[in-house]
Amino acid sequence: LFRLGVMIQMTWPGAPTITYGDEAGLCGWTDPDNRRTYPWGREDNELIEFHRQLIRIHKDYQVFKTGSIMFLKGQYKLIGYGRFDENDKIVVMINSSDEVREADIPVWRMGIIQETRMARLMLSDREGYSDEAKVYPVVNGLIHVECPPMSGMIIKDIESMG
């Protein structure tokens, strides 16, 4: 769930803020034990790299800083929202359930035309994360996605990937 929260934070409107040590897997409890010493030499390197990749995506696309937001899908433990502007159209899907969830996402609401294709920039699930692209064709203004259990995906229109 932590990585899903980070994905939302890096794609939601506003400036994302990381609390000291979160990127390394630092745990804390209630005050005064809410922040411990940084775990030098014991960092969660996979989690650090996950943060780096999401920060890179956030920096690479102006839409995350100044674009609009629109809810595209809302079901029990499954949400999808779009971030869009005149240059980029991006879908973020979050599945917090223990089951695979499938959904048709109405990308036409962000102005995506039927012949457009979209590609996944990142997938995060129980196994870790991947930036391996997967292409989603837009059919009748929709993309069909299959979200693994406890997963998040960032999907972007290919025409503006540059």
Segments predicted by a language model, with ranges:
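Carbohydrate-interacting/catalytic domains
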Residues: 2-5, 11-18, 22-162
